[in-house]
Structure formats: C-alpha cells, structure tokens
C-alpha cells in the first residue's frame, strides 16, 4: 500500500480512494475486506452473504454518513458476522483513537416501535455493556445472538467501550435497526475533529 501521505489528514489512512479527498481505512483480517471513510456521504457496498447484516450495515453507513465497503469470504454465519465486526473495528481503531478527533459519541435512534441509545468511546479498553436480550430471536434468517457477537467483535477490534441501551421496542428487526442507526451516528460523532475545549 505504500506509506501514508501527509495530506491524508488526522484520520490517517490505509489507502486513499481515487477521486476522494478524505482518508479511508482498510482492513483485510479474517478474509474480510473493509474500506471505510469517516468523511463520506453514507454510500455503502456490502456483500456479507447475509442479507440482514448487509441491511443493518447499510443503515449504519447511511445514518453515520460513512462510506463503507465490506466483502466477506463465504463461511458459516457465525464466522462471517464475527469477521465483519472485527474487521470494521480494526479499520476504525486508528482514526478514532487519534488525538485530533473526539473519539466518543452518543446517539439515540428509532425504528418504528424500537428506540435505542448508543454511547461509544475509543478508549482502548474493549467492553460492551448492554440491556438488550439478543439470545434467542431470529430475524430474516439471522439469529440475533450473532448481532451480539458482531458488537463484541467490533468493540474488540476497535478498542471501543460500547454501551447499548434499548429504551423501547419488542420487534427484533426494529430493535436491530434502531441499534445500528444509533451506532452509525455515534461513530460519526466520534470521528469529528476535536474542538479545543474537548
């Protein structure tokens, strides 16, 4: 990939997308390839092999105004979801831990009956604290327990402290959509330039 040019800005770079002024990060761990730009427009190109996960990551990108590309090698669903979370976290780890960005974000988002609150900090201490029971339900053929695995792998890969609170909602699909919308916004906030008083 070569060295990172000084023009890449505070987020650092994995590679630069041709024709884009903003830096992006690339991770190629666990046969997952992720490219993400924190200074995007919400465009996404996701091929995880799991339509529900594709949909949820598309919401994350759109609500966070992140440009996100993700390609996964075919595998068992459990491995695919874990790989996606870990690779995305690793791609975000360096830019969100930079002293030049806020490194933390908080957001509330709704999806029909569901309302979720996410607080994220690039603390270097991976931890997920959640009041959401994702142990048994299924949506679109995906066990929601795998989404819990995604969040844990995201936190581990990125070094994030992640608090997930479900304020309201019973429908599993809507609960997951609210969580991923709020997560996208919180990531966007974490990537904003740090103001002097912060």
Where are these regions (language model features)?
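Polyanion-binding surfaces on beta-sheet-dominated domains and ring/shell assemblies
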Residues: 16-198
């Amino acid at each position: 990939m070569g060295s990172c040019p000084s023009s890449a800005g505070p987020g650092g770079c994995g590679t630069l997308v041709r024709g884009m002024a903003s830096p992006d990060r690339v991770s190629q761990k666990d046969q997952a390839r992720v490219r993400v730009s924190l200074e995007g427009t919400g465009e996404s190109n996701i091929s995880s092999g799991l339509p529900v996960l594709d949909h949820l990551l598309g919401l994350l990108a759109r609500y966070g105004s992140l440009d996100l590309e993700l390609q996964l090698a075919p595998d068992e669903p459990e491995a695919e979801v874990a790989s996606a979370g870990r690779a995305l976290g690793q791609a975000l780890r360096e830019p969100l831990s930079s002293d030049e960005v806020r490194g933390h974000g908080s957001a509330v988002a709704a999806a029909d009956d569901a309302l979720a609150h996410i607080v994220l900090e690039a603390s270097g201490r991976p931890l997920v604290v959640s009041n959401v029971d994702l142990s048994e339900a299924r949506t679109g053929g995906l066990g929601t327990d795998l989404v819990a695995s995604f969040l844990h792998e995201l936190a581990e890969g990125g070094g994030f402290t992640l608090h997930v609170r479900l304020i309201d909602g019973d429908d599993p699909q809507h609960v997951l959509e609210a969580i991923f919308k709020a997560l996208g916004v919180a990531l966007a906030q974490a990537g904003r330039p740090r103001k002097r008083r912060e």
